[in-house]
Amino acid sequence: MNNNYLSLFSLYFLIAGCNSHQNPSESYFPNNFNEVSQIKYVQYIIQGKILYKANCSHCHQHSGKGFRNLYPALIKSTTLINNTGSAACLIKYGTIRSGKGSNLNMLMPAKTELSNLEIAEILTYIGNSWGNQIGFISVNSVEKYLVDCTPH
């Protein structure tokens, strides 16, 4: 069983480290999961990273640092940490907000084509990268979050 954990961690760090600007050893990995939960968590992290690169990194950057005052950084994000439901709504329905300290408006495009599973995977990835430590975000959680959303 310990060999399974070692293999699982090795696979996670190998895949997460490929072509990444983030040091995989800095990713948060909860230690209170059973073996099945750990496997599911790693799957969500890996798929979430792929989805993040395809859907989010153009604005938020591969490093999660965002872009100037237009696109917020995801590093130690208070929105992710304190209001994961709001983050799920932003991914699904997008928003238009004033940029920090500027007269510019920034647009976060709606990603209505993403399934609840894909949103859960993205949230699990970004929520456990760059200093964030929110743990596993399930599809059921995303479904509950989206019920309370008001599409923009």
Model-derived segments and spans:
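Sec-dependent signal peptide recognition
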Residues: 2-11
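Axial heme c-ligation environment in periplasmic c-type cytochrome domains
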Residues: 68-75, 96-150
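Sequence/structural segment immediately N-terminal to covalent heme-attachment motifs in c-type
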Residues: 41-67, 81-93
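Electrostatic cytochrome c docking/interface patches
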Residues: 22-51
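N-terminal hydrophobic targeting signals that begin at the initiator methionine
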Residues: 1-2, 19
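C-terminal motif of bacterial Sec signal peptides marking the signal peptidase cleavage site
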Residues: 15-17
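Cys-nucleophile CN-hydrolase/nitrilase-fold catalytic domain and related Cys-dependent amidase chemistry
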Residues: 78
